[in-house]
Regions:
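C-terminal terminal-subdomain/extension
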Residues: 55-131
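Compact nucleic-acid interaction/catalytic patches
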Residues: 12-13, 17-58
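Short beta-strand or tight-loop elements
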Residues: 5-7, 17-19, 63
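Generic structural signal for residues positioned in beta-strands
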Residues: 8-10, 34, 50, 64-66, ...
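Short coil-to-beta transition motif at edge beta-strands of beta-rich domains
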Residues: 2-12
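A short, polar/charged loop/turn motif at coil->beta-strand junctions and beta-hairpin connectors
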Residues: 3-5, 29, 59-61
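A near-ubiquitous, low-amplitude feature marking generic local secondary-structure context
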Residues: 4, 50, 80-84
Length: 131
């Protein structure tokens, strides 16, 4: 299954820690992409980007992006999780929310440096491809 920015998945299935994760960047030439999850706004330390109830069909109450848990992963690894039943693809998010989330990697004090640098490189590559 090809993966793309804006797709979402539930992970890890069967766990109380299961969250909705977002593929934030297009995969690079090695299949690597940045991913980040939504978490409850209540009590969250990082409120850089807030997603309001109803902005995605999974979001039933105000939610925020948890940049501190943002990671780099590969299309191969996500496919392994899907095949093993520990992840399940969900409905994609709107393009404007993807942009907001991607911009938040730079703004959040909680983003890991390697993740921030990867996202910046992917944004630069996307601008180069689009002229």
């Amino acid at each position: 299954m090809p993966f793309a920015a804006g797709q979402t998945y539930l992970f890890p299935l069967g766990s109380q820690l299961c969250h909705l994760w977002i593929i934030a960047t297009e995969p690079d030439e090695n299949g690597m992409f940045a991913t980040v999850n939504f978490t409850s706004l209540k009590g969250a330390n990082d409120q850089t980007v807030i997603i309001r109830a109803g902005e995605h069909r999974f979001v039933k109450w105000d939610t925020c992006v948890q940049y501190g848990l943002g990671e780099l992963t590969s299309t191969e690894r996500l496919q392994e999780f899907v095949d093993a039943g520990t992840a399940k693809m969900h409905h994609p998010i709107r393009a404007d929310l993807v942009k907001l989330i991607v911009d938040g990697f730079d703004c959040s004090d909680f983003t890991k440096r390697r993740v921030r640098e990867f996202v910046q490189a992917r944004k630069t590559a996307a601008r180069s491809q689009n002229g």
